[in-house]
């Protein structure tokens, strides 16, 4: 059986934490920021985590992460 391939786009966007969760950056942070409040932009700086329902799909995309 051939080696499993890592999805390179996903590998650039996710990092594994010590407990096995997947950490991700948040969207809506690159441009058109003038209409967003300071509070919204501050919350977008914080890391997000992949939900438990999506974790199984992500493990297939990132078998060696």
Curated annotation (Swiss-Prot):
SUPFAM superfamilies the UniProt entry points to: L35p-like
PROSITE patterns for this protein: RIBOSOMAL_L35
Its keywords, alphabetically, are:
Ribonucleoprotein, Ribosomal protein
Q: Name one GO cellular component term.
A: cytosolic large ribosomal subunit
| Region of interest (Disordered), ranges | 1-26
An annotated Gene Ontology molecular function: structural constituent of ribosome
InterPro entries in the record: Ribosomal_bL35, Ribosomal_bL35-like, Ribosomal_bL35_CS, Ribosomal_bL35_sf
Gene3D superfamilies reported in the protein's UniProt record: 4.10.410.60
| A biological process term (GO) from this entry | translation
Q: Family per UniProt?
A: Belongs to the bacterial ribosomal protein bL35 family.
What is the official name of this protein in its record?
Large ribosomal subunit protein bL35
Q: Which organism is it from?
A: Clostridium beijerinckii (strain ATCC 51743 / NCIMB 8052) (Clostridium acetobutylicum)
Provide the organism lineage as a comma list. Answer: Bacteria, Bacillati, Bacillota, Clostridia, Eubacteriales
**Quick one: which gene encodes this?**
rpmI
């Amino acid at each position: 059986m051939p080696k499993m391939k890592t999805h390179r786009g996903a590998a650039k966007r996710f990092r594994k934490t010590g407990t096995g969760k997947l950490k991700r950056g948040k969207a809506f942070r690159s441009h058109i920021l003038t209409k967003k409040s300071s509070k919204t932009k501050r919350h977008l700086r914080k890391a997000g985590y992949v939900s438990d329902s999506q974790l199984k799909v992500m493990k297939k995309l990132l078998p060696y992460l």
